[in-house]
Amino acid sequence: MSILPFPADAAGATHRQPNSRMCFACGLENPVGLQLSFYDDRAGSVVAETVIPAHFQGYPGRTHGGVVAAMLDEIVGRTAMTEDPNRFMVTAKLDVRYRRPIPVGEKLRLQGSLIRRKGRLAWAHAELRLADGSLGAEADATLMDIDSSVGDPAALGWRVYPDRSGEGEGG
């Protein structure tokens, strides 16, 4: 998988979020996962950039729709972590709209925004943008808090890993 350095135009999203060891979406030690890194502005917005390798394709040259849904699911969940990186939530509902085919081998940008919170619930929106800036897919999600025994940071290997660009651990 091609890993891109932190996007310079992230509009204030400079706080690197933690990753886990083996999560499919963010596990940096998962050899068959997406290995996504996320940055937030500590106020509800999260960004990530990546290039999807060909082994995640469905139709030739196109990212499998399930992989697209997984990326959108991960970033909506991370919007709830912008104020507390150890606040784990699960997706209760994910409404994905595929707007155009998502190519493999090209730069993609994920953006997520926390819409609101109420008690144990949160609502978020995410977009996946293609290299030309066009909208490839989007999702709206309802999230809910999980039991702290399930989301134990130590058991997940949850920590801020150094940037792959070699610039350190971020903020």
Model segments located where?
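Hydrophobic beta-strand-centered segment that forms part of the acyl-chain substrate-binding groove
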Residues: 75-109, 114
